[in-house]
UniProtKB/Swiss-Prot annotation:
May bind 1 zinc ion per subunit. Keywords: ATP-binding, Cell membrane, Cytoplasm, Membrane, Metal-binding, Nucleotide-binding, Protein transport, Translocase, Translocation, Transport, Zinc. ATP binds at residues 85, 103-107, 493. InterPro entries: Helicase_ATP-bd, Helicase_C-like, P-loop_NTPase, SEC_C_motif, SecA, SecA_CS, SecA_DEAD, SecA_motor_DEAD. The gene is secA1. Part of the Sec protein translocase complex. Interacts with the SecYEG preprotein conducting channel. Has a central role in coupling the hydrolysis of ATP to the transfer of proteins into and across the cell membrane, serving as an ATP-driven molecular motor driving the stepwise translocation of polypeptide chains across the membrane. This is Protein translocase subunit SecA 1. Its cofactor is Zn(2+). The keyword Transcription does not apply. GO terms for molecular function: ATP binding; metal ion binding; protein-exporting ATPase activity. One of its GO terms (cellular component) is cytosol. Monomer and homodimer. Part of the essential Sec protein translocation apparatus which comprises SecA, SecYEG and auxiliary proteins SecDF. Other proteins may also be involved. The keyword Cytoplasm applies.
Amino acid sequence: MANILRTIIENDKGELRKLEKMANKVIAYSDQMAALSDEELKAKTDEFKQRYQNGESLDDLLYEAFAVVREGAKRVLGLYPYPVQIMGGIVLHHGDVPEMRTGEGKTLTATMPVYLNALAGEGVHVVTVNEYLTERDATEMGELYSWLGLSVGINLAAKSPAEKREAYACDITYSTNSEIGFDYLRDNMVVRAENMVQRPLNYALVDEVDSILIDEARTPLIVSGPVSSETNQLYHMADSFVKSLNKDDYIIDVPSKTIGLSDSGIDKAESYFKLDNLYDIENVALTHFIDNALRANYIMILDIDYVVSEEQEILIVDQFTGRTMEGRRYSDGLHQAIEAKEGVPVQDETKTSASITYQNLFRMYKKLSGMTGTAKTEEEEFRETYNIRVIPIPTNRPIARIDHEDLLYPSLESKFKAVVEDVKERHLKGQPVLVGTVAVETSDYLSKKLVAAGIPHEVLNAKNHYREAQIIMNAGQRGAVTIATNMAGRGTDIKLGEGVRELGGLCVIGTERHESRRIDNQLRGRSGRQGDPGESQFYLSLEDELMRRFGSERIKAVLDRFKLSEEESVIKSKMFTRQVEAAQKRVEGNNYDTRKQVLQYDDVMREQREIIYAERHDVITANRDLAPEIHAMIKRTIDRFVDGNSRAPQEEKLDSILYFAKYNLVPEESISLSDLQGLSDEEIKANLYERALEVYNSQIAKLRDEEAVREFQKVLILRVVDNKWTDHIDALDQLRNAVGLRGYAQNNPVVEYQSESFRMFNDMIGSIEFDVTRLMMKAQIHEQERPRTEHNIVTTATRNISAQESDLPADVDLAKVGRNELCPCGSGKKFKNCHGRR
């Protein structure tokens, strides 16, 4: 272990030596750039672009380009990047993460690699965690970029598609991570290429990269639509039932935060809902409602996991930032269960149309980099998941902050009493204090304590994040006391007021350890920026969440030996601090393993999504007749059906093929059994394909011009693809839940998921081709003078096909259809999974 650490440290030192040499080469251009007039300096941008077009690489241009930005920043912003900022900029250009402490000027550091990469003309995305930072950074740094001749766009959720398209077309685009993700998904749902807003994803520079790529890695971005459902009553019934339970009726596993009914709970459920067996196959839907009601009532906690807004909406609280996540909803019915629990209106369930996780979104960029003050603890995950390194950058000035040993109290009451005393003492002498909490509930509790003690203070949490920047900016003033949920206000510097340095600078007090060391380090890092004095102190108790869930028995044994009572003094021990960090490492390891497993599942979806989106993009952008593609679909559909029935007895086989042809390919009266008798399977395929092409050509002939033909083909294909893909996403979600249980049978759930999802994907492709074939052949297309609108085309196709979608021809003899043959109704499903089970 010691050797591994030594190797890592030596590698970091070697990397820093290289970066210093490169930074010195940039600095060597300083006098040359300073001697240029404003116009000459601005002209460098066009010169660099031309040199890039002539074959020079961005690496070749790096030293001069960085020097130009440095000089430009001095003239426009009055800021001159330090050597350490140049080093950070080089790391960013190389597609890695420079770990730069709070207050070291990460925003200015980013200007150099952003400018350099924008010269390629393929777009640079500067990604922030919220729209306040998006607008702030774009406005402040945009002044420099515009002065140097580059265009800057701001992408906000409220902007129209046209405004978004304009923002993405700029050399540099500022946006939040979520908006880039949603725009990507929406772009892959449009019917016309001109409605897309994004260019291909080129280079992303992510601010607070650990927050987005680690903390929110598992968060799926979901575009969904409402599902017609009458399930509100079930949510309320399940909620009423769960609220009637005693503690003995359910079992909670604290570490994993899972819950289920005990035997007595199952008995009560069967009595309450008048069932013989709760876990009968017919009651699967009901058990899902009960499970969600259990989670909502006994796992999800008000003011910690979510808050109720003034508009009576359930808003999710981000566990890592303490902010409410506007527009986000828990999936799979959990959000509705919480709404029923809190007595607010239960909103309709939705169906997922498209989804992607941040892990897979950002891995799509040609080059990815990011900035943060705390990434080294997650170095392995950055390397394994995103193939990017973490390089610690030295501070411009030595860190003067004093980090005190943790203080441990036996109970929450005694801990908070000590916190209030500490805050009061520091407030009286004028030292500003920032108190960090992990939940809204803790903020409110501590705020009441401070009010009772007569200490004026500000509270920053999920309930008032709109004042976030203002509260944080004032947190360094003399006598200021600020309570901040977790890392609220991250991205805004706390500058010390007059006379505060002499009082010891900003004191940061943590009211408990977070499950991630990185989050604790972020809180500490709010103090002691740019060599300022400061202090940090963590107060812990045995009743803290981390200690309850993961505290080791050794800690408890030590405390028993000390025989602490609530009134007695606190423990301060290096051994204890090490034990807490060991618990944190265990949690971090668990979380990393979870994210890794999520990625394994999501990679399956990613591969399938990329295939569907690529095919979809080809259809959208094709400015040609799509007949060759449609002909191929028709041929494969015919081949698939004939092959699927090839082993059936001859009479049954011909009957099935005849019904298939009549109701999916050609007019009923145009084909009979005699047309198929005496033909081999290959001859039948050729015969049906020839007939189908005749029908296809007659359908297309009804459309007066080429534009109408292309429009009809595109809309028809996209409608089918989108419907099938939406159903497939739902099916994959259900599969993922199902394969988890197979682990009990010694099967690897991920391998099972990969295998099963591959089969389902192939089935979906077959189903898409079947539906395109059937719609193309059976849609009623009236001769027309001009192209019909997308809406009319789709409506006609839907209206004329929907009646046949699941209706069985009256003269079908079901007894003659084989279980594994395709159902003659034309659904594309096997008979045993369709009309064969009715």
